[in-house]
């Protein structure tokens, strides 16, 4: 069983809301303070939590009080009054903090994603980003604290809902910005995040919150198949028409096939040399296609043709379309988005009398609950040994299966 978490963001997401939801789930505030102290910036802030109510519902509000500015009270992501730091400086702070390995890795990834987005907005390299949004003390505490909390809970996979756009404008270090702010839009663009308008005309998603969600979440949209064990509620600062609470569901995966979103590209061709088809296949696989195949079809004027079908991740649609337009004679491509169920796939090695062979094992569940559905030796490994020893491919294939069954 995998431990799953699902970020439900009806009123958006911010770093302090993430911390609040984690503390609400049981992450000790003392644990966070203890490990955050390793960053060497604990003189710049005070971290504490309290129970609050939002539209009648109770949640946990985490405060990051900046001691460098005693008048600071709204903790808004864009109004930092703490030291500005470059990305390399923050990376060094994190590496030197002796954090748990997962928390360190996640923290570095979140900051790099945030710097990538901010750099793209301002037209500079990520490592040269030097302004409030990345360097502020509360952003560091929010991001590293969230990663510490997720690690403390033992989360294996994080998922996230669609995000509300919000509206209006917000004051930032670079002036007055429209909501959603440019960095948030760029982060959404990088992960193709589904968004919607919930009618609330305020900033609902901050760059820090967006960076955490877009970096650490496996998928966006509806919740994964899971048994919900507990829900943590992290309170935002503003009073909104609906409860301003980030809801973090904690649970275990259920024994059902995993779901993933894929894109299907299709085009009909009747005037391309058959010799080119093989090259098109290779080019599509090189840019990230998951599968490519053709079907024989009849076309206009009774001409025989092919239906070229490409299955790829949603973020590979553009590059796959470019290959198809460049390498074929088609004038148009159909694009479908579908969901597919997949089994867990693992690669194991087995030893035969002629050498080692990789074996792909398809299963569902883990440990005592694991159920194996299919075992297949890798074609290329079998072919290489068959050629090397001048024996039939099927013999190597059979020996590999026998080795797996006897392992």
From Swiss-Prot:
One of its GO terms (molecular function) is nickel cation binding. The keyword tRNA-binding does not apply. InterPro entries: Ni_insertion. Keywords: Nickel. Pfam families: Ni_insertion. It comes from Gloeothece citriformis (strain PCC 7424) (Cyanothece sp. (strain PCC 7424)). The keyword Nucleotide-binding does not apply. This is Putative nickel insertion protein. Belongs to the LarC family.
